[in-house]
Amino acid sequence: MSFGIFHRILWLFLCANTLIVYLVTGSISDAVVTTMVGSLLLQLTYFANVLFLLWRAHCARRARQTTGQFHGEEQPGDPRIAGTHGRTDGDPCFEDEDSR
């Protein structure tokens, strides 16, 4: 999930949560507290998801390197550039403004 989509869902959830808690309890302080707790839980979940994706990418890269060693293949490019192995073709991060 991209950050933009997450950000919209976060704000939708927080506004709906605040409104519902206020309508049910009639207390602004309860609405603020539950909104802050919900915000914290959603942010922790997003952070855990990012860590999981990094771990999964690391495992996949390690598996590719291991199979390449068994077959005598070399990894192309610079492995210090994450995800590209040194190749910038097709990567939207390296596209020029004119090529879009």
From Swiss-Prot:
It comes from the Bacteria. The chain crosses the membrane at residues 9-29, 35-55. GO terms for cellular component: plasma membrane. Its main location: membrane. InterPro entries: SyrA. To Rhizobium exopolysaccharide production repressor protein (ExoX). Could be involved in the inhibition of exopolysaccharide synthesis (EPS) and nodulation ability (nod). This is Putative exopolysaccharide production repressor protein y4xQ.
